Design a protein with these regions (language model features):
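Surface-exposed loop/turn motifs in large extracellular/passenger domains
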Residues: 27-180
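Gram-negative bacterial Sec-dependent N-terminal signal peptides
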Residues: 1-26
Length: 180
């Protein structure tokens, strides 16, 4: 993304500590769209999440959510857990322009994911459409994936659809598994 686009960006910097769900693995996020229609296409956006204990995600779009965006910059860092840049699930639809994603995962038996586009709900198709995507992924754990695009629901017919322009992925996982 060019600097002139970043100058127009609305910066939402969320340094979260302890915000999350009541589940065993709490989540922290920059933007969570669950089951609603959300349009942020008028300006570029930047989301930053740094977690010392929980599982951070830059953007979560779930439960048949519809998210429309302009250019997006995501920076997600985890000190001690897995991390994901963009998580699209449950029949949700994302339509956007260019993305820059930086994800740094914690050490141990944890995954680092740039983009996860999946559908685990019954009879739902998750769709992800973007322009050019640039990722910088660093892991210190067992697995690192640039893009996971798959349906693994157990009830009904599930599907995924992933479309993007040019994709550039730079990855380092401390000598462990890298899947692009």
């Amino acid at each position: 993304m060019k600097m002139k686009n970043l100058e127009k960006a609305i910066i939402l910097s969320l340094m979260l500590s302890g915000v999350g769900s009541s589940s065993a693995m709490a989540l922290e996020w920059g933007l969570n769209n669950s089951g609603t229609t959300f349009d942020i296409s008028e300006a570029s956006k930047s989301y930053s999440v740094h977690s010392t204990t929980d599982k951070p995600m830059g953007i979560i779009n779930t439960n048949n959510g519809i998210l429309t965006a302009n250019d997006i910059v995501l920076e997600v860092r985890s000190d001690s857990n897995e991390a994901a840049g963009f998580f699209n699930d449950g029949g949700s639809v994302y339509t956007g322009k260019n993305m820059e994603i930086t994800v740094v995962g914690g050490s141990g038996n944890f995954m680092v994911n740039g983009i996860v586009n999946q559908s685990t709900g019954a009879n739902n198709a998750s769709k992800f459409t973007a322009g050019n995507i640039k990722m910088d992924l660093t892991g210190y754990g067992s697995e690192l994936y640039g893009i996971i695009n798959g349906s693994h629901g157990i009830n009904g017919n599930n599907a995924v659809d992933f479309k993007a322009g040019n994709i550039t992925i730079e990855a380092n996982n401390d000598g462990n598994l890298i899947g692009i």
